[in-house]
């Protein structure tokens, strides 16, 4: 097979597993509902993209949930499959996506999927360990390019990047919190059970719907930067081999 044709086919296949467009569309549905002052609809839209209970959330908590989801999934929904695609092509990218999807479906700590879910969660933690950190660093640069507070993003990243039950999720959430001068994290109800969590970032100002838009901008800029970095590494590898 022609190598350029193979690359084109693999790129098209991998495009299907990148969550960039989906994340933006679903989070902006929450944003639109909030701008329309329809908290009930915003809660419902948020419930489509988060695992926490949303029925009793305030406007600020709904906004925070959307921001956290976009920030976290920038790493495991975009940068991770992109990195694995550059390492092992479509097969490795799809293998990663399978692990990530399994974690999303059964990785919660409930009695029904306790052991299988624990295995899925540990696999996902392992698979996302490097991508999450790459995403965090790229997002700090993205914050600078978007004229956000990159210095604060770096500070909160260093301080709060482990303030999460997952070893990876706070990598990009901490950068987002610092860049936007907001506080993320904190406990929530999952399946009717309260789960305490540490906060991420400083409570400098109230979270507002426009932060969803800014987080999407961060997500896209981080994705572009990551593509450039991975492509440069790939080209250097080809040059070395030749």
Predicted feature descriptions by range:
Residues 1-94, 107-242:
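Hydrophobic alpha-helical transmembrane segments
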